[in-house]
Amino acid sequence: IAQATEFIESKKDGFDEYVEEKGTSLSGGQKQRLSIARAIVKKPEILIFDDSSSALDLVTEAKLYKAMREHINDTTRIVVAQRVATAKNADKIIVLDGGVIVDFDTHENLLASCEVYQDIYNSQLKREGDSNE
């Protein structure tokens, strides 16, 4: 689910690999995927992801959230994100502007009616391209 298996198995000792203090032997994305895996294994009622996939590329991030949608149905997931690609598959999205909630709806409805969301979406679309995952 956390998209960590491939890079773990590529390590010399695989799942027995020693990780240095503060994870200095890992990339930022690898650290994030291990942290997510550790949280998922605990099977909590609520998972809060506060920009926890910001170091992941868009493809890995899309795979991560798709796997969570498919395999973690009994856990409430709250995702704090700056990328529309991260938030667009959520049941509901809260849009903040200057720390104030300006809208709360689905991706499709926000695209149709929320100027702040439209601006964010359009600026990110130009920078990153539209991820359809």
State where each predicted segment sits:
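A short, proline-enriched helix->beta-strand linker immediately N-terminal to the Walker B motif
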Residues: 41-45, 74
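Conserved catalytic loops of ABC-family nucleotide-binding domains
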Residues: 70-81, 87
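ABC-fold ATPase nucleotide-binding domain signature/coupling loops
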Residues: 5-34, 49-52, 56-59, 126-133
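ABC ATPase nucleotide-binding domain "signature" region
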Residues: 27-28, 34-39, 63, 79
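Helical segment within the ABC ATPase nucleotide-binding domain
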Residues: 61-73
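C-terminal portion of ABC ATPase nucleotide-binding domains
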Residues: 8-14, 66, 88-133
